[in-house]
C-alpha cells in the first residue's frame, strides 16, 4: 500500500492509502487476479477439487497436465483482462484465444501476443467480440469462456473473476496497520 500522507493532510483525513497494482507480475494491472483465479477455479472444479486444495506449483506441474489435460481459454478484451488471461494460460501450460475489437491499439495487441495467446483484432465492437469468443469456446473441444461480463446462463465464471479481484482487498487488509473507517 502506498501511504499518501500529504494528500490525506490536504483532504483533512487521518490517512489515505492506495493499492498500487502497477507492478503485479509485470503486467501493470490488477485484471490478472480475476482471470487467473477463475481459471484455477475452473481447473479445480473439473478435477473435483476445491480451489483451496491446489496451489501454483500443482497448477504448473506435469501432474496437472496428466490429470487435467489441455484447455483453451477464450476471452474478449480491450486490453488488460485479455492480457491477464493470456498470461495465466501461459503460466499454466494451457492455451488462450483472445479477440479484440476494431480500433484496438497495437501495443495492447502486442502485449497479449507476447504471452503466447492466439490474438486477433476483429472488425466488430467489444460486445460482438464477446459473442464471437463465446461461440468459439462452445465449438472448441475443452474450450472455456473466461469473460468478466455476465449474461443469462453465464454467471459463474464472471463471479469467480470478481472473487479473484477481491485478492486486492485481502492484501490491503493484511498490509494496513489501523482499521480503516471507509
Indicate residue ranges for each PLM-predicted region.
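PLP-dependent amino-acid enzyme catalytic core
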Residues: 1-182
